Amino acid sequence: MLKAAGIGVRLAGRWLLEQVNLEALPGEVLAVVGPNGAGKSTLLKTLAGEIRPTRGSVSMAGKALADWPARERACVRAVLPQNSTLAFAFRVFEVVLMGRTPHSRGLEGERDRQIAREAMAAAGVAHLAERLYPTLSGGEKQRVQLARVLAQIWEAPPDSPRYLLLDEPTASLDLTHQHSTLAVARNFAHRGAAVVTVLHDLNLAAQYADRLALLKDGKLLVVGVPDIVLTPEWIETGFGLQTLVMRHPRLGCPLVIPLGSASVLQPGEQLAHGK
């Protein structure tokens, strides 16, 4: 379990996170949602150990995150940032193979190469293996980086859960690859990993996440299954947006229909949930 206990983050005299308590459990996808500036990326970076909390603590598998040696932590926890910069002309296969560095210490064996190939297939980039990374589109680069972080924790050490942290993994992707990427994340969770992902699209979160955490102004408003979080009341509190929330006719999950921040419903209409 990845656990944030009362964490607060203060930078440049401003609290970016305040008193956040959150748990990410093996076998589930936890989606962090909220408006711009809510603290979503700050929370993910704090869970990843990139930002040390001003208050509170973060633990992984019952052990304080700060007490994990860097290489051991990298063997079980992988992070996909919003932007990954790589200017050198590596082949795509070489970029994905870099994910195996914590395990191989730079001496990759055949098993590492096989894992890289499997991760590329999972991320849908196997056909790009021999392409030079700088020649790829933004969406292709994002999917290659997803393959890299998958390869990093493809196999967990014995008796150790894995943690996959994704910061807006669908931001530069087309509709097809938004869904395929989140399907990969969900499948990874089904293999026993704890997946935490920052998402802006509430309908994607409803479809693929087991639980949602709604942030606003650095505070955690509510956490729970999609039916609990994705209500017209919570969405208006978090985003200042009026919505209709209905039941998806095929998937059964909440379906959020924006009405606009200043919309006025017609007489007789109600903000509905589950209808």
From Swiss-Prot:
Positions binding ATP in this chain are 34-41
SUPFAM superfamilies hit by this protein: P-loop containing nucleoside triphosphate hydrolases (SSF52540)
Q: Which SMART domains match?
A: AAA
What is the membrane topology noted in the UniProt record heading this document?
Answer: Peripheral membrane protein
The EC number(s) this enzyme carries: 7.6.2.-
Keywords on record: ATP-binding, Cell inner membrane, Cell membrane, Membrane, Nucleotide-binding, Translocase, Transport
Q: How does it assemble?
A: The complex is composed of two ATP-binding proteins (HmuV), two transmembrane proteins (HmuU) and a solute-binding protein (HmuT).
The family classification in the record reads: Belongs to the ABC transporter superfamily. Heme (hemin) importer (TC 3.A.1.14.5) family.
What NCBIfam families does the annotation carry?
PRK13548.1 (NF010068)
Put simply, this protein is called: Hemin import ATP-binding protein HmuV
Q: What is the lineage of its organism?
A: Bacteria, Bacillati, Cyanobacteriota, Cyanophyceae, Gloeobacterales
Q: Which gene encodes it?
A: hmuV
